From Swiss-Prot:
InterPro entries, alphabetized: Helicase/UvrB_N, Helicase_ATP-bd, Helicase_C-like, P-loop_NTPase, UVR_dom, UVR_dom_sf, UvrB, UvrB_inter
Disulfide bond annotation, renumbered to this chain: none
Keyword annotations of the record: ATP-binding, Cytoplasm, DNA damage, DNA excision, DNA repair, Excision nuclease, Helicase, Hydrolase, Nucleotide-binding, SOS response
Organism of this sequence: Rickettsia akari (strain Hartford)
Gene this protein is translated from: uvrB
NCBIfam families: PRK05298.1 (NF003673), uvrb (TIGR00631)
Lineage of origin: Bacteria, Pseudomonadati, Pseudomonadota, Alphaproteobacteria, Rickettsiales
Domain remark in the UniProt entry: The beta-hairpin motif is involved in DNA binding.
Residue window of motif Beta-hairpin: 91-114
The protein's name in its UniProt record: UvrABC system protein B
Molecular function, one GO term: helicase activity
Amino acid sequence: MNHFSLISEYKPAGDQPKAIDEIIAGLNSKKRSQMLLGITGSGKTFTMANIIERTNRPTLIMAHNKTLAAQIYSEMKSIFPKNAVEYFVSYYDYYQPEAYIARTDTFIEKDSSINEHIDLMRHSATRSLLERRDVIVVASVSCIYGLGSPDLYYQMTVNLEPGKSYPRDKLLNDLINLQYKRNDMGFERGCFRVKGDNIDIFPSHYSDKAWRLSFFSNELEYIHEFDPLTGEKLAKLDKAIVFGHSHFVMPQDTVNNAISGIEEELQKRLEFLKSQNKLLETQRLNQRTQYDLEMLTETGSCKGVENYSRFFTGRNAGEPPPTLFEYLPKDALLFVDESHVSVPQIKAMYNSDRARKEVLVEHGFRLPSALDNRPLKFEEWEKFRPQTVFVSATPGPFELEETGGTVVELIIRPTGLLDPECIIKPATKQVEDLISEIQATVAKGLRVLVTTLTKKMAEDLTAYLQELKYKTSYLHSNVHTLERIEILQDLRQGTIDILVGINLLREGLDIPECGLVAILDADKEGFLRSEVSLIQTIGRAARNSEGRVILYADKMTKSIDKALSETLRRRQIQQEYNEKHGIIPKTINRAIHALATLERVDSKCDTKQAHTLFDNTAKLKANINKLNKEMLKAASNLEFEQAAKLRDQLKTLEAAARELS
């Protein structure tokens, strides 16, 4: 399919039709940068979706963290079910980069844990960009980090068509060059197996589909898509393209040229270190690099191969590395979501990476070429980005400068909801007053969000409210992601009534049940009480018709004054629109998606209980297969908390199956 097909029961409403028309007019007139100022609950994602459908251009949406990227991906996936909506974020569950601390002479080895499902989705994203046009890639800002060259990545593909001849040994060798592994016993993603006249391939971009190639001599007769779990045939294919199992696959002559380049740089660097009388650094660099060269010669790869990426891509020192932006077509469209946060992150990423690597190079742990394995500099990102729409409720200085201060506003909500009423109260007895406000709000069946300045204040206030028998919890950076999801679900379901946090605006909190947002010490100027932070926090109460905000302050700061003035301006515009069109504000009643549980076996169930639930091996194996498919499906839908529960249940059943056998 080459056209986007938006499927939704809703039509653009409020400010959305006007905003969509203005942005599209700007794109058609070749404006490079535009600013979409969308307040909380105004339907920014739906507006973006309509712009994408009408312009019919491949699109990249950048978000400032994985969580927000996942939310946008999920929404876009539901709006465009017939198109390629992809997810591209860092595939590390855990990442400790290599580093050297000179003052203590401590070297920290690189340590990481790769999430296979996210790696799969990254491959799916790059494949879609190279094969079709109806593509939306939702990415975190990590997409500006180096990636394999798109030219080499596409050059290394294996194209398969029935009726053509493929010498068996050459085909198997080509698959190995793509970093696929032969595994006739365990068939998993990135593997192939050979059975008689058939070759089965499990592509890197699939989790639940594989390809069976049926040969007569060297002639490929059929390509069947099948379920790798059950063996069931799903479809007959006219052609198939096998992409590399890594974005860093490359032909052997490229590897050989890279080895020569690395050896040449090594000799120059060793001579320089010797001239500086740095004998330890000389020995260290020679030993580490020679080992890497040996691994590259024998296997075509080595640990930390990305540090030599400049030699593989053929780029000169200082040139930008290939990134996801080089996979985009020339007429692509870019949305930068929450640009007031995303843009400063992009600016900061190069400098922090450079500072760490310069120490490694200086002390002989890496060659100077390792400095070119990096994220894009901000000015490079500026050069590479296509036509861009910045999206934020609180635009930053860069976006306003780029657009000449011209913004396209989304102020009218389709629901008719107004920006919340804001009240200033003295901070002297803020906790005492807060308790009475909590009492009144909770009595209405609504929830309360409270923001403090420090982690200790959040914990102390939570403990105090719990002593008073209020159902309270707190949220800050030390709370694990999955635990945070559970806390937010508990808040929406009423298991807890009050959530205390430090910087709640950064958590992406959208709680329709929220009736009160309390900002403690609102007059303490700083990052947490800046104009942008206050406007974002006030927005947390904008999804309920009874939403209110109390700012506890003993003096009127510039930030409070500007935040309240902007909120009042928006509220007046919304009121006038509602009166003119006879709209009554209506609270968003969004469904609460609870964590699903399986009745057949609990994750805490032991193997004896599993035996009683499934009295024979056949039943047990059937349920293991079913559970495994559900786990993979949950992971591919980014329902990681559900996938983790299914994984635990799967382990229990597998242990029971081993005992029965």
